[in-house]
């Protein structure tokens, strides 16, 4: 059965479930301190083969593992676990369109920013909406934001973690507030 976005199936802690049934402790280190690392894996639907193809999956998983090591997560998952979770999640949703699959490792349970674990994972498919080909036809109205990328000495941008994207959020909000589609 194909699920709508509001009721899509996600993978959380080894189980496929409705996104609305997913639960993460609000006092977990991931909720309180942004202790997570993630990949947004582009997947492209091919009409001729009726197949979904993940783009550079191994490279994405190498970066996810590298980010987890840099942020000092104890990983219980392997690249094979990552791939199986992604495939199972996509199959559970029966999507036949381009996706960005968010694969996130996070610190759950109770604890502080120094907590060791437990390190858990969720996998969530997100329909991509417009493609770059559509943007190429219409164009994008962009601005250069006043917000700058963080320095490697502060919070390393080599770690793909949620906390590293706050500047992107405030830059995007600045662009939208000023009438632009996005920011550079």
Question: Predicted regions span which residues?
Answer:
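Helix-start/capping segments and mature chain N-termini
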Residues: 1-74, 84-88, 112-184
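Short, acidic/charged, Gly/Pro-enriched secondary-structure junctions
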Residues: 82-110, 126
